[in-house]
Amino acid sequence: MTSSQLLDASNLLWDHWTGERRLDQIPEAIRPSSRADGYAVQATLEPRSGAPLFGWKIAATSVAGQKHINVDGPMAGRLLRERAFDSGATVPFGANHMRVAEAEFAFTMRRDLTPQWGPFSVGEVVEAAGSVHPAIEIPDSRYNDFTVVGAPQLIADNACAHYFVLGPAAPESWRELDLSTHALKGEVVGKLARDGVGANVLGDPRIALTWVANELSSLGIILRAGQVVTTGTCVVPLEIAPGDHVRMDFGVLGGVECRLGPV
């Protein structure tokens, strides 16, 4: 894609995101046709934030999730600082189209991971992580039907990133736990609850974290100290509505909650 095409696609997506509007797909003349094109468009969204990048997310970490949106593998997206909240916050609901909340393991990095020729190992990436947190992602898409547009357009649309809620850091003993078997519960208080387990994200949240680090490395992007990486939903996404109270219980690792504002 040319720089002009990238900018036009970026303008279109940003205007729809901030204006809470939808489109069927990016017009063919400026549509990304590869994952690389999608990431190039996504990168032009970051400077519009006006704040340092908060972190990264991974989408489509399960086979079921990949089939649902018709992609053949995970995708990375950017978490913008102005759309990140602490546990207990009221999160805007607005014109959210997807209307789900997801329970996720999030990691805060304590040192940079600079791109390298070969892949990072799980051990290398986990050593570079400083803390793990229970987290809530409230995704959304700028497309009317995000299940049909394909990976390049989904990546351009920031891999369905929208709002994010970060819980307190878990005790340092998390390093001694097998996160793949760690059980958790997601709840919309008074409405529904679903159980989950760490293995639901690429077999282990630490593997999902490593996938993000290696995806960024392949793109020449530094995963920086202080950035947060959220690793995908460990529960079947919870249906939400304005005014709901969402709570995720990660057992000994703590919990995270938020309330949803009005439309």
Where are these regions (language model features)?
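Active-site scaffold segments
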Residues: 106, 209-210, 230-232
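Structured functional modules or segments
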Residues: 221, 229-244
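Short, intrinsically disordered, mixed-charge
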Residues: 131-134, 138, 211-221
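Buried hydrophobic packing segments
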Residues: 45, 166, 209-216
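Catalytic-core "active-site belt" of small-molecule-metabolizing enzymes
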Residues: 2-204, 245, 253-263
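Short alpha-helix capping/helix-loop boundary micro-motifs
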Residues: 31-32, 214-216, 231-233
